[in-house]
């Protein structure tokens, strides 16, 4: 499903033109998951410079090489390019917005879902992106039954249960 989730370009066509693939795996023996992810992004960014590179399979989707490289530029500031590592899916159903992660498990965290939010897609996406960045940066664990204080006047509940967008795994549901 990686080609079908690609955003802003015809990844299916690129995949059909592909004649070969290169698989890169970083196995952290002593490095942290964040350090291993940083190394992986650096290697893949370099490989996108090769002539004929059509796509990078990352974050559970196919990413256009230039877009992958551009997102990787945040490594110079000591940040991880979230869009290259964790896919943020967004959907609408009966006037409600939902969102989910795919790839957060690679950092030792369960996938996160927001289900049935009355907020708009942009607000839900931005909240999920900020939450994922926070979880990866701090290593904080979201636990069943916890409340997450998101502003001085607002908190959201956390529940761990079978996934909605990802039914094959248990996910953390955040009631945003």
State what each model feature region is.
Residues 1-87:
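Internal, hydrophobic cores of structured domains that mediate oligomerization or house catalytic pockets
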Residues 62-176:
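Aromatic/basic-lined ligand-recognition segments
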């Amino acid at each position: 499903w990686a080609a079908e989730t690609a955003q802003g370009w015809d990844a299916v066509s690129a995949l059909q033109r592909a004649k070969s693939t290169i698989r890169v795996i970083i196995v952290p023996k002593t490095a942290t998951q964040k350090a291993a992810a940083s190394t992986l992004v650096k290697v893949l960014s370099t490989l996108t410079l090769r002539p004929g590179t059509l796509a990078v399979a990352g974050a559970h989707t196919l990413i256009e090489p230039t877009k992958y490289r551009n997102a990787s530029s945040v490594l110079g500031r000591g940040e991880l390019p979230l869009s290259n590592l964790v896919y943020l899916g967004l959907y609408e159903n009966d006037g409600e917005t939902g969102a989910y992660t795919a790839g957060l498990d690679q950092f030792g965290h369960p996938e996160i879902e927001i289900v049935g939010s009355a907020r708009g897609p942009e607000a839900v996406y931005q909240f999920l992106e900020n939450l994922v960045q926070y979880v990866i940066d701090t290593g904080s664990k979201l636990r069943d039954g916890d409340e997450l204080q998101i502003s001085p006047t607002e908190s959201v509940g956390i529940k761990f249960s079978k996934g909605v967008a990802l039914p094959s795994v248990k996910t953390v549901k955040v009631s945003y």
